[in-house]
Regions:
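N-terminal structural segment of carbohydrate-active enzymes
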Residues: 25-70, 82
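Glycoside hydrolase catalytic-domain groove-lining segments
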Residues: 94-95, 106, 204-234, 239-323, ...
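Substrate-binding cleft and catalytic face of glycoside hydrolase catalytic domains
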Residues: 30, 60-81, 86-238, 308, ...
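Short, electropositive alpha-helical surface patch
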Residues: 124-143, 148, 238-255, 326-341, ...
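Positively charged n-region of N-terminal signal peptides that target proteins for export
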Residues: 1-8
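Aromatic-rich peripheral "rim/lid" segments of glycoside hydrolase catalytic domains that contact
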Residues: 26-28, 77, 143, 157-164, ...
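Bacterial N-terminal signal peptides
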Residues: 8-16
Length: 399
């Protein structure tokens, strides 16, 4: 009996040392967030559809997903399908994206459509005559027609195949430049002309109104479908005042661009996606700074004052120093406390919080993912066990 008791004691001790699995031990985060008016979102890649442990975690705690790359134009556009068409419009391959949205639908999870128009990594052949990279760039009207066709067909495809699942679209991503070398002098919108020295092909060949036109095409598609799909502008550093001011100027230009039959401005843009990478890029300096919480709050309210919804779309609370784990957990608690109080006091302008840095990363130092999300930036570790930051978020929402 003594041996059995000793064995049982050891087993109990071992069990106590095993980290708790979030989906087994805790109420869903999205259930706790619902009374405060916002969804809880997670990223999903096509490869993760084969990771059942990750899928279980997402199902347990999140009621919104964002496909990381698979709904972007460079993923959907297909040259073979394009050249097979007889109308001269672009063709798409929805295979990977459809599987991901199907999974979301099967599990009662909404999808943020990300993204219809983004200059980064955009396929060059989309802008060329006859879609041939060896030929000159096509004229402006051709690019407008292609973009309208692309946006209309993509929005229509997902709404008709998965009604109501894609509840919002990032129509345009990161169109605001960061430095005066990236936008024209005197442009209050800071509309991006260059990205890392390369021209913004949408602005170059579609024109300075390409953002407003993209929203117009998307709004027309949504209204034709009779869908309740919200249309967002999405950008990083959207809580820094200078960039936020330019974003507001851009959205104001979008929402005064087109008029209805009565001459009233059509609100083409419904909301702002604040990506939410918080802290230094690749370095600990600038991470876990309490003043950032107030800055985020202030800009959410500034966007809301324009009649816009807000979502935190790609949040990563960066941490490059493992010894700062407790401080980071406390920072996460302050952040969610602010979200809850802000919505309670201001009519729920914040509609979703999507966490991009969901897990830690083992990407090598200096790697893009290392810099973007940080090695210790997750709510969960590399094995998907909960971290103190998750517990703090949970306790804050549950109070």
């Amino acid at each position: 009996m003594k041996k059995i008791a000793a064995v049982l004691s050891v087993l109990a001790l071992l069990c106590a040392c095993v980290p708790a699995m979030a989906e087994e031990t805790y109420e869903p985060l999205y259930t706790l967030a619902a009374p405060y008016g916002f969804k809880m979102g997670a990223p999903l890649s096509f490869d993760q559809l084969r990771n059942q442990k990750y899928l279980n975690l997402v199902k347990a705690h999140f009621n919104s997903i964002t496909t990381t790359n698979e709904m972007k134009a460079y993923s959907l556009l297909n040259l073979q399908a394009t050249k097979a068409r007889t109308d001269g419009m672009p063709g798409m391959n929805y295979s990977a994206a459809d599987q991901m949205v199907q999974w979301a639908q099967d599990n009662g999870i909404g999808v943020r459509g990300h993204v219809l128009v983004w200059d980064a990594y955009m396929t060059d052949w989309f802008f060329r005559e006859d879609y041939d990279s060896k030929k000159p760039y096509a004229d402006q009207e051709t690019i407008k027609a292609r973009t309208e066709s692309y946006i209309t067909e993509v929005v229509t495809h997902f709404e008709e195949k998965f009604p109501g699942v894609v509840y919002c679209w990032d129509v345009v991503n990161e169109a605001v430049g960061d430095s005066d070398s990236e936008y024209a002098a005197g442009d209050a919108r800071h509309l991006r002309t260059l990205r890392s020295g390369s021209p913004n092909l949408f602005r170059e060949y579609m024109g300075e109104d390409y953002v407003a036109l993209a929203f117009l095409y998307a709004k027309n598609a949504v209204e034709a479908l009779g869908a309740d799909t919200k249309l967002y502008y999405n950008d990083y550093n959207a809580y820094f005042s200078d960039k936020a001011q330019a974003i507001r100027a851009l959205i104001d230009s979008v929402n005064t661009f087109a008029q209805d039959e009565n001459g009233n401005n059509r609100q083409l843009c419904d909301g702002v996606g604040m990506q939410g990478y918080i802290g230094g890029y690749g370095v600990q300096e600038g991470c876990l700074v309490d003043s950032h919480v107030g800055m985020i709050r202030d800009e959410i309210l500034n966007y809301a004052a324009m009649g816009l919804e807000v979502q935190i779309t790609e949040m990563a609370v960066r941490n490059f120093d493992l010894t700062q784990a407790d401080k980071r957990a406390a920072f996460y608690a302050k952040l969610f406390q602010m979200f809850m109080e802000l919505n309670g006091e201001n009519g729920n302008p914040l509609k979703a919080v999507s966490i991009w840095g969901l897990t830690d990363t083992n990407a090598p130092k200096g790697n893009y993912v290392y810099n973007l999300n940080s090695p210790y930036g997750g709510l969960f570790d590399l094995k998907l066990n909960i971290k103190d930051a998750f517990v703090k978020v949970y306790e804050t929402l549950k109070q």
